Amino acid sequence: MNFIFCTARCRRTVRQKPLVSLCVPVYGTEGLIGRFLDSILAQKDAPLFETIIVNDGSPGTKELRSIVKTYTKRFKERELPLVFLEHSKNLGTLEARRTAVNAASGEYLAFADPDDELTPAALRILYDAAATSGADIVHGKAAVCGMEDEPDARSASFAQKAQSVYEGVLTGGEILRKFIVEHSYSSFVWGKLFKTDLVQKAYSEIPFTYCTMAEDMLLYFFTALYADKYIGIPDTVYNYRINTGLTSRRQITDLAAWQKVCSASSVFTILFSYLNDHPAVGSDIREAVRDLGRAHYADNLKQLEICVVPSFQEEARAMLEEWWGIHN
């Protein structure tokens, strides 16, 4: 994997090492990242943090570089480190986040998408909760924006999941169980703060994988598996904009776009492989993973029927079956 540093970290002493690393993958959302970066610059009373932007081979690379160059000056004026990394080709959201995690120097890290925003006190609220509780996962609430343009049942269901937080403390095995078996809170990685070494450990279980769908669930499965303490808080820390990113349900007119949808199957290939190699994992968790796999496959079939143009429905179905293999 090739990437280059386009913006060096601002000089700082050991004492100025950032406490939080904000990891931001970018692909095709250059037109929206300015609003996101403004929300970062507007953070109030935040701990020292760095922002790591990963250009995942975006078709708008030239525009993105120009925007980052402009914002670099503003970040430097605030003495906020800004790091810009690039993949030479599109590797998918999971791998773009991995690149950011590997570059992170903060004790904690957070994920964000460039078409969303942080609320003004998000980083302070999340960090304070981590520091006072000792939790290695802090989960805040998200507000879902854009529902007025997407009033359908699917959007409403997504909004409900995005706002789902277990308000309280979980420890040990209950962290994973409450998420994957009881569905007590969401697995979206945005709106959360993590111990950096915890996420790095989670990534060590995940082989290189092209994945742009369900990647949050894959990463969070292993993060929750290894976490010692989770705390959910009532504060809204994230503004999610529905129907602006890769997960939006739009008409699919080529096989490259359809491949991104099918990539959800990679998540379950990895999870099933892990479960096969670790027989001690509880039967309730195994069944929950199987149920999620069935649900994602069913959703892919629905997308095939609704979103894929008729001219290549047959090819798209063959691709879907090839990606899912024995899991269909």
Question: Which residues make up each language-model segment?
Answer:
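Cell-envelope/extracellular polymer assembly enzymes that use nucleotide-activated donors
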Residues: 19-21, 50, 218
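N-proximal low-complexity "stem/linker" segments adjacent to membrane-targeting elements
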Residues: 1-42
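Acidic donor-binding segment of Leloir-type glycosyltransferases
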Residues: 37-86
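Donor-binding/catalytic cores of nucleotide-activated saccharide
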Residues: 117-231, 240-258
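Short alpha-helix within the catalytic core of nucleotide-sugar-dependent glycosyltransferases
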Residues: 37-38, 65, 98, 106, ...
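C-terminal subregions of glycosyltransferases and related glycan-biosynthesis enzymes
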Residues: 2-17, 213, 232, 236-328
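Short aromatic/hydrophobic "clamp" motif used to bind/position activated sugar donors
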Residues: 109
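Glycine-rich, basic loop-to-helix element that forms the pyrophosphate-binding segment
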Residues: 84-104
